[in-house]
């Protein structure tokens, strides 16, 4: 079940995290950068949002935001990796050369 909601992603470079506010709840993905790779390390989403079906729309918005730039994505967080694996055709160009998930 996909929720149809517009999700705005903000890059908080000082805290090294992508942020979004959904239904007045803060969602965070912590990251680190090396060369031209973004390592998505930790996802913090309130259970009420996960239970409400907001995880996939949030990850779609996040990966779309990253896709606009020139970085590749290394999903070290299991939930993000699972989502990318499920949608591998859509996001295969975001993975570094030679990396499979």
Model region roles, listed by residue range:
Residues 73-94:
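Short, compact, well-ordered microdomains
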Residues 61, 96-97:
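Generic detector of low-complexity/intrinsically disordered segments
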């Amino acid at each position: 079940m996909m929720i149809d909601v517009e999700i705005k992603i903000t890059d908080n470079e000082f805290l090294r995290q992508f942020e979004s506010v959904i239904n007045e709840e803060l969602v965070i993905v912590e990251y680190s950068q090396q060369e031209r790779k973004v390592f998505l390390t930790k996802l913090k989403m309130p259970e009420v949002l996960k239970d409400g079906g907001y995880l996939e729309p949030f990850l779609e918005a996040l990966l779309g935001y990253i896709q606009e730039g020139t970085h590749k994505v290394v999903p070290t967080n299991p939930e993000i990796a699972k989502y990318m694996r499920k949608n591998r055709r859509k996001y295969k160009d975001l993975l570094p050369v030679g990396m499979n998930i």
